[in-house]
Amino acid sequence: MTRVVISVGGSVLVPSLDAHRLKEWAEALINLTNAGIQIFAVVGGGGEARRYIEACRDIGLDEASSDEIGIQVTRINAALLIGALKEYAYPVVAESYREAKTAAVSGKIVVMGGVTPGQTTDAVAAVLAEEVGASMMINMTAIDGIYTADPKKDAKAKRHDILSPQGLIDLIMKEKMCAGSNMVIDLVAAKITERSGIPLVVIDGRDPALIEKALLKGEFAGTIVGNSAIRFPIV
């Protein structure tokens, strides 16, 4: 069975606590499962996690402790997604890579949040893709791909259709030098992707149906990092 790890940004899964939005995501993941793809979803904390982390800093907590609380928020979001998936999901949020691999034996959708302080859920997804031998990692975020520059700030920015792992790392390093920059994926995740050789695909997560269109219908719009030989649909 084809295995796919999906990093679902909290900002696209739960921009607000909206049951309809969660059901849309659940429907998309269930349709992928029914098509014969085993899904692993790593859920981010979104704006809620950032608010908690900021509150932690305001009361004087150290960064590691603040991260731990942020991780708890990602796991709450993961639990919400499990609830929406119902019997299609493994019923417990995986809190480690070992737990995720054990849960995968069930054949159900495995959902997890953060794991380690200082590590983003994108990095968690990249490591998980290695651990479970995924054929690809998909980053579902609030933009439709990786651009030459921030499209919100540069009208001339163009979306990359295909990008090498080193090209992604170079782009992230360039952006990190600019105050307030906001890359689609972080440097650690990009380096893990380069190491593993597992292709990274970036798709606009604001519409959950787009992942179905790409994987099941071949209607792909986004950026492929790594193996340019990937062809959609994958089943």
UniProtKB/Swiss-Prot annotation:
Listed GO MF terms:
ATP binding; UMP kinase activity
* Subcellular location, principal: cytoplasm
Q: Which cysteines are joined by disulfide bonds?
A: none
Q: Does the keyword Nucleus apply?
A: no
Give the pathway listed in the UniProt entry for this protein.
Pyrimidine metabolism; CTP biosynthesis via de novo pathway; UDP from UMP (UMPK route): step 1/1
Which keywords has UniProt assigned to this entry?
A: ATP-binding, Cytoplasm, Kinase, Nucleotide-binding, Pyrimidine biosynthesis, Transferase
- The answer to keyword Heme applying to this record is no
Q: What is its EC number?
A: 2.7.4.22
UniProt activity-regulation remark: Inhibited by UTP.
Biological process annotations from GO: 'de novo' CTP biosynthetic process; UDP biosynthetic process
Task: List, alphabetically, the NCBIfam families matched.
Answer: pyrH_arch
Give the protein's function: Catalyzes the reversible phosphorylation of UMP to UDP.
Return the similarity comment. Answer: Belongs to the UMP kinase family.
Designated name of the protein: Uridylate kinase
Species this chain originates from:
Methanocorpusculum labreanum (strain ATCC 43576 / DSM 4855 / Z)
